[in-house]
């Protein structure tokens, strides 16, 4: 097992030289953040990210994440092109020593945290989720702390409507279709996928 730390790229408020100071730290878990979901991560962007890590003596073996486009999750006709792009991302990342890609297949919302600064009894802070706080939110006009507001309210409502009526079995079938499409690239590169 290797000790790694989440790093949100060059704009992260925690610089790599701080991460390197953590005893036993061997690498970072990061991603390319300036490419639209579904597009190919060009090798020059990956190389630049890896060079930043290398400069600080940190490995870049884990990527979290290469986002899965909603059209793939929904099983739309555009999914085959998007899956091909995802497979190319796997191949491109493999050229730079990446061994694991973390991803999710959750519809619309990657994650929910209702508080980015939950204060514990010892004074430490952490991210937290409260079901009670979540249930108070207007699901059609969500604004959560630290959330990437990728969608306008109209786009969000459209996506939610697209998922209306989708069964668990249909979503799972779309996940299997996606995995069947990307596994050849994983086999070629030796990259593991972590959901």
Features from the language model and the residues they span:
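Extreme N-terminal starter segment of soluble prokaryotic enzymes
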Residues: 1-3
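Active-site beta-loop-alpha junctions enriched in small/polar residues
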Residues: 6-10, 30-35, 65-68, 105-108, ...
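Short, acidic/polar
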Residues: 9-21, 81-91
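Conserved, mostly hydrophobic/aromatic
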Residues: 19, 28-30, 53, 93, ...
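Structural motif
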Residues: 22-23, 96
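Glycine-rich, proline-tolerant flexible connector loops at the mouths of alpha/beta enzymes
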Residues: 31-47, 109-111
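Active-site acidic/histidine proton-transfer and metal-coordination neighborhood
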Residues: 72-195
